[in-house]
Regions:
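N-proximal, solvent-exposed amphipathic alpha-helical segments enriched in charged/polar residues
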Residues: 8-47
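Extreme N-terminal, non-catalytic leader segments
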Residues: 42-45, 50, 63, 70-126, ...
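Short, aliphatic-rich beta-strand segments
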Residues: 49-63, 192
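Conserved catalytic-core segment of NTP-binding enzymes
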Residues: 77, 228-229, 235-336
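Walker A/P-loop phosphate-binding motif and the immediately C-terminal alpha-helix
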Residues: 121-159, 272
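Phosphate-binding loop that captures ATP/GTP phosphates
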Residues: 145-208, 212-219, 310
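Phosphate-binding/switch loop-helix module in NTP-utilizing enzymes
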Residues: 198-245, 264
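C-terminal boundary of histidine-terminating zinc-finger modules
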Residues: 336-347
Length: 383
């Protein structure tokens, strides 16, 4: 009799009613997205629920593959599911569909650009001045996003001083197909630069409107295809090229790059003011050359002073997304076409770039959710 009872309990869950989809959703309503501050059920993240006896399987579809807390969310989901009476095993698969930038309509917005129809988010990486490792930051962020599973493109908008082709290794030069250009790929990332169409060792001598025309072609006549993020490496200044981009493409937001010292902040503030005037959200600040760790003493040395990025972020009410240390290997990798996040993923600078990429993706997701009405209000301040 005891044997029959045991068998019956194994088959029926000890007399408990079977686990239902409603039970699963009720349990997962306790799991909140840390950025959107809503539960993952009401946000529509929970998909493909499958219940087989005491095993529950499902997908949690996030708003970006670059979400740095996806493993934490997965663990929370599994823990909540195992609290349901009758659930012995929880199988949670984390997926992602990058949300599309849908800015609120304004008169200043450009018309829809067919060449960019498949691009979900366009992010400007800018500083207003040269020499702050802006291009290095753009390259490493692009690869950090790609490593997380995103489809990424990289546009070198510095017509007068293009450096991206030196910093990455693309498989072939850009090819012409009719009226459009097919960009080459550099280890999975689509890349375009004026240096691909000229002798890289010679100066590009163009008047401002002509330089703007080159960038307009890159935005309207390049087959970017389906991308989660198009990273635009901005040139120094606040002139024709910057205005052309804002008139041709709808930017999701801008990442501001600075070094710690005040002489950098003078020009960087002008770039921030430009984006505010153009009604482009500033997603945050990244500080490069923040410190150097000495091999001998293992201490941080603030060679270019300290706190500039933090002051800038506080001044404009945005987030300081990260501080990148000085590492000679970054410069070597840039010269040899080997991005630091690929060649030294465990290095402190690579981890910092990866963290910034994750924070940037989350900021874009928050902004997109707000524009779509998922959120009533939000703050771009990162804590």
């Amino acid at each position: 009799m005891g044997l029959l009872t045991n068998m019956r309990e194994k088959l029926t869950g000890g007399g408990r009613p079977p686990v239902t989809e409603a039970d699963v959703k009720a349990a997962l309503a306790n799991v909140q997205d840390p950025d959107l501050h809503k539960d993952i059920v009401s946000l529509g993240f929970v998909r493909n629920i499958d219940i087989k006896g005491d095993i529950v399987s499902l997908d949690v579809n996030l708003t970006t593959p670059a979400c740095p807390v996806k493993e934490q969310l997965k663990t929370q989901c599994e823990d909540e599911l195992k609290k349901i009476p009758g659930v012995r095993e929880a199988r949670v698969t984390m997926t992602a569909t990058t949300t599309r930038s849908t800015p609120k309509q304004t008169e200043a917005q450009p018309a829809v650009n067919p060449a960019l129809a498949g691009v979900k988010n366009i992010i400007a990486v800018a500083s207003g001045k040269g020499g702050v490792a802006k291009s290095t930051t753009a390259v490493n962020l692009a690869y950090a996003l790609a490593q997380a599973g995103s489809k990424v493109g990289l546009l070198d908008a510095d017509v007068y001083g293009p450096s991206i082709p030196r910093m990455v290794k693309f498989t072939k030069p850009a090819s012409q197909e009719g009226a459009t250009v097919v960009p080459p790929e550099a280890e999975g990332i689509k890349v375009i630069s004026v240096a691909m169409f000229s002798d890289g060792g010679r100066a590009t001598i163009l008047r401002g409107p002509m330089a703007g025309g080159v960038i307009k072609q890159f935005l309207t006549q390049v087959e970017w295809g389906e991308l989660d993020y198009l990273i635009i490496d901005y040139p120094p200044g606040t002139g024709d090229i910057q205005l052309t981009i804002s008139q041709t493409a709808t930017l999701s937001g801008a990442l501001i790059v600075t070094t710690p010292q005040e002489v950098s902040l003078i020009d960087v503030r002008k770039a921030v003011d430009m984006f505010k005037t153009l009604k482009v959200p500033v997603l945050g600040v990244v500080e490069t050359m923040s410190y150097f760790v000495c091999d001998g003493c293992d201490k941080k040395h603030h060679i270019f002073r300290q706190g500039g990025g933090e002051r800038l972020a506080r001044e404009y009410g945005v987030s300081l997304l990260g501080q990148i240390p000085i590492d000679p290997a970054i410069a070597v990798g840039g010269d040899e076409g080997r991005p630091h996040v690929l060649t030294a993923p465990s290095a402190a600078a690579s981890k910092a770039y990866t963290d910034v990429a994750g924070a940037l993706a989350r900021q874009v997701s928050i902004l997109n959710a707000q524009n779509e009405g998922v959120l009533n209000s939000f703050s771009l301040t990162w804590t």
